[in-house]
């Protein structure tokens, strides 16, 4: 039979579920939104760690196994546990653990007075009332029976000194502090307003400068477009005039066609390219003229003629 082990496991699982319910209900009362799965996971991780690291789970399950073995007629483990609990070494070890816990509490700021008071008294809240009930524990009862409780009359007979508070002077002090704070806030606010106005003025001035520059850019763009259109018209007129003049010349058709092809290759849309094309055409004409002059010069020499520039 493992009924005791199953009961202990059930108690541990129920404790975990109670911890989850306590955590979620506390969050709901505080008005904090939460994810149930996340709370469940975090509480389970912490609960399992504490139960395993402290050895509480293994201790409870071990005692449950011992009880089940005793119920099944196996008393060896129970006898060993009884002997272990009554051994002087075990008692010394328990005293050592208790002393360690006391020193740990002292290091955390929980002194002896607080430990004794917490062990002797507990407070029970009354629902719906601001008052509460102070309950004495069994330790307090034992101390009373042993005569370890005394009444200090000095706390009862001592008269409470009532300090007279000058609320008017306090109010005046608070009013002065409030006025001083109000003045500082007002000065800071006025300074901030002045800075904001200055920033706005600078912004408006910058906007005006940008607007003027944009207008100038638009005027320059318009002028450039007009200049480009005029140049395109001039180049187109130039090409037409040269073509008309070329047709009136007594040159051969091949020469005319060659010059017309060069004229038609001029880019009339982009003035920069048009200037480059005209420069190339003029260079070609000068080169043709130079070749013609050299041919004429050679013919004159062959005919024994001389030439001179006038």
UniProtKB/Swiss-Prot annotation:
One Pfam assignment: Rota_NSP3
Main subcellular location of this protein, as a coarse class: host cell
BP terms from Gene Ontology: regulation of translation
Keywords for this protein: Coiled coil, Host cytoplasm, Host-virus interaction, RNA-binding, Translation regulation
Entry GO MF terms: RNA binding
Region (RNA-binding): 1-146
Sequence segments annotated as region (Interaction with host EIF4G1): 205-310
Locations listed in the record: Host cytoplasm
Region (Interaction with host ZC3H7B): 167-231
UniProt keyword annotation of RNA-binding present: yes
Dimerization: region residues: 147-203
Gene Ontology CC entries for this record: host cell cytoplasm
Keyword Oxidoreductase among record annotations: no
Any coiled-coil regions, as ranges: 163-234
Assembly mode: Homodimer. Interacts (via the coiled-coil region) with host ZC3H7B (via LD motif). Interacts with host EIF4G1.
Free-text function comment from the UniProt entry: Plays an important role in stimulating the translation of viral mRNAs. These mRNAs are capped but not polyadenylated, instead terminating in a conserved sequence 'GACC' at the 3' that is recognized by NSP3, which competes with host PABPC1 for EIF4G1 binding. The interaction between NSP3 and host EIF4G1 stabilizes the EIF4E-EIF4G1 interaction, thereby facilitating the initiation of capped mRNA translation.
Family per similarity comment: Belongs to the rotavirus NSP3 family.
Record's protein name: Non-structural protein 3
Organism field: Rotavirus A (strain RVA/Human/United States/P/1974/G3P1A[8]) (RV-A)
């Amino acid at each position: 039979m493992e009924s005791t082990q199953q009961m202990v496991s059930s108690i541990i699982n129920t404790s975990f579920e109670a911890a989850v319910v306590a955590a979620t209900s506390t969050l709901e009362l505080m008005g904090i939104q939460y994810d149930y799965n996340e709370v469940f996971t975090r509480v389970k991780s912490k609960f399992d760690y504490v139960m395993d690291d402290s050895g509480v789970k293994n201790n409870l399950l071990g005692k449950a196994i011992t009880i089940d073995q005793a119920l099944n007629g196996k008393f060896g483990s129970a006898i060993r546990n009884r002997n272990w609990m009554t051994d002087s070494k075990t008692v010394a070890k328990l005293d050592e653990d208790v002393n360690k816990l006391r020193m740990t509490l002292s290091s955390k700021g929980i002194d002896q007075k607080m430990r004794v008071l917490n062990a002797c008294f507990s407070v029970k809240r009354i629902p719906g009332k601001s008052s509460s009930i102070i309950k004495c524990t069994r330790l307090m009862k034992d101390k009373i029976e042993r005569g370890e409780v005394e009444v200090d009359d000095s706390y009862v007979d001592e008269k409470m000194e009532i300090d007279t508070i000058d609320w008017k002077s306090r109010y005046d002090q608070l009013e002065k502090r409030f006025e001083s704070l109000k003045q500082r806030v007002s000065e800071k606010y006025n300074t901030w307003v002045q800075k904001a106005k200055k920033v706005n003025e600078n912004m408006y001035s910058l906007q005006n400068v940008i607007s003027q520059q944009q207008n100038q850019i638009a005027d320059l763009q318009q002028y450039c477009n007009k200049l480009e259109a005029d140049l395109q018209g001039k180049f187109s007129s130039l090409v037409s005039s040269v073509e008309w003049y070329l047709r009136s010349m007594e040159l051969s058709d091949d020469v005319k066609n060659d010059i017309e092809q060069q004229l038609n290759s001029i880019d009339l849309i982009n003035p920069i390219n048009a200037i480059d094309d005209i420069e190339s055409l003029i260079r070609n004409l000068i080169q043709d003229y130079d070749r013609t002059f050299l041919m004429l010069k050679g013919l004159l020499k062959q005919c024994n003629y001389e030439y001179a520039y006038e």
